[in-house]
Regions:
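N-terminal alpha-helical targeting/anchoring segments
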Residues: 1-133, 145
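TRNA-recognition modules of translation machinery and tRNA-sensing kinases, especially anticodon-binding
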Residues: 26, 130-420
């Protein structure tokens, strides 16, 4: 959530930068500024009236002692009038704050200056590529057919489309990837968290999934709880309403979780097999840092995620997302994609983002600096990595007549070198 200070002091700049995200902010920004003025005017009047009430209250006792009952009664009447006025002013201020908050949560984060102009995925800028795209025979199979051939995935029998059931070596490959990613994160200095898979609305609001992505989240109505779309939500919310010490920063956490997304409106080739699921496994990395260090942290996270896709020997590329493809809460995002040699397309396996102070302002996640001043933290997170499309690319790219070759780094975790 943007701060009132930024909105009121940098109105034109805020409107200009939000236009990069194709968000027309003029009307809502001006409404917020007007409400903030109402709030401040009400507060000023309240403060003045309270000062006067205190002054008159002190006078009343003296007037009574001096026998000036009529003057004391006038002062009492004025105190009563001022208190009644203050009740109205307090109600006006409270309503202005409520209306202002309801508008603030509708405004996306400001994009970083380096975010390219663009309307969608086609305008994202490729920053770097690596790995070798394998040359496969014409009869090479897509991963959903390989899963059937090798009997490693049972499909939609239990829950329906988008909820895969892994079997045998398929299940062991999933577990191997999770353990490999968690071990790598631990070795890189991340502290492992085991989070819940359901959160309350306040947690979803804190990281920005609510209200923006409410329609994409599974909601347990009876308990008013949400299935998590990513471990980012519970892990980042650990630091809600917390004031950290500067010496505690940066905080590095990692977590494995199942993730749940409704993916309403998805259809066609993008949803075949493991391309787009309602439930999937992912390892997440989360960092909390000082504002002046957060972009260094972002670079380190990008480097770390690159090391994972390189270790899996997959062809990869890094995209800097354009304004039109940037998420509601992100200031800058780098997407990692791996190439599917059979589908002939790039598959997203990670997004690494800096949210600057946007989430922290919602969460009230702060730190006390060297001067003992309380400041908003910057929050960052990234997928490290999301499993389904990694599995899809591994199955397709590593298929041979003898079976599917397992990357060397995974063999100690799987206990086998090929699926055959």
């Amino acid at each position: 959530m943007l701060t009132i200070k930024v909105i009121t002091e940098q109105r034109d700049e805020v409107i200009r930068r939000l236009a990069v995200k194709h968000f027309d902010a003029t009307e809502i920004i001006d409404r917020i500024i007007a409400l903030d003025k109402t709030r401040r005017v009400s507060q000023t009047a309240l403060d003045a009236n309270l000062t006067e009430v205190n002054r008159l209250s002190k006078q009343i006792g003296g007037l009574m002692k001096e026998g000036k009952r009529a003057e004391a009664d006038e002062a009492k009447a004025e105190v009563s009038r001022l208190k009644e006025t203050n009740r109205t002013l307090e109600a006006d201020k409270t309503q202005a704050e409520k209306d202002m908050h309801e508008l603030l949560v509708l405004i996306p984060n400001l994009p970083h200056a380096s975010v390219p102009e663009g309307t969608g995925a086609d305008d994202n800028r490729c920053e770097e590529t690596g790995g070798t795209i394998p040359e496969l025979p014409a009869d090479a199979l897509p991963h959903w057919e390989l899963a059937r051939k090798y009997d490693i995935e049972l499909g939609v029998k239990i829950t329906g489309a988008g909820f895969p059931v892994y079997k045998g070596k398929g299940a062991r490959l999933q577990r191997a990837l999770v353990n490999f990613f968690l071990d790598c994160a631990r070795d890189a200095g991340y502290v492992e968290i085991e989070p819940p898979y359901v959160v309350n609305a306040e947690s979803g609001y804190g990281t920005g999934q609510l209200p923006d992505k409410e329609g994409q989240m599974y909601h347990a109505n009876l308990d008013d709880l949400y299935l998590i779309p990513t471990a980012e939500v519970p892990v980042t919310n650990i630091y809600r309403d917390v004031i950290l010490n500067e010496a505690d920063l940066p905080i590095r956490n990692t977590a494995y979780s199942a993730c749940f997304r409704r993916e309403a409106g998805s259809y066609g080739k993008d949803v075949r097999g493991l391309n787009r699921l309602h439930q999937f496994d992912k390892v997440e990395i989360v960092r909390i840092d000082r504002p002046e260090h957060s972009y260094t942290s972002l670079e380190e996270m990008v480097t770390y995620v690159r090391s994972l896709v390189e270790a899996l020997e997959l062809p990869w590329r890094i995209l800097r997302l354009c304004g039109g493809d940037l998420s509601f809460t992100s200031a800058l995002t780098f997407d990692f994609e791996v190439f599917s040699a059979v589908q002939k397309r790039w598959l997203e396996v990670s997004s690494v983002s800096n949210f600057e102070s946007y989430q922290a302002n919602r969460l009230k996640c702060r730190y006390r600096d060297a001067d003992k001043k309380v400041q908003l933290c910057h929050t960052l997170n990234g997928s490290a990595l999301a499993l389904p499309r990694i599995v899809a690319a591994l199955l397709e790219n590593n298929q041979t007549p003898e079976g599917i070759i397992i990357p060397k780094v995974l063999v100690p975790y799987t206990g086998f070198e090929r699926i055959s």
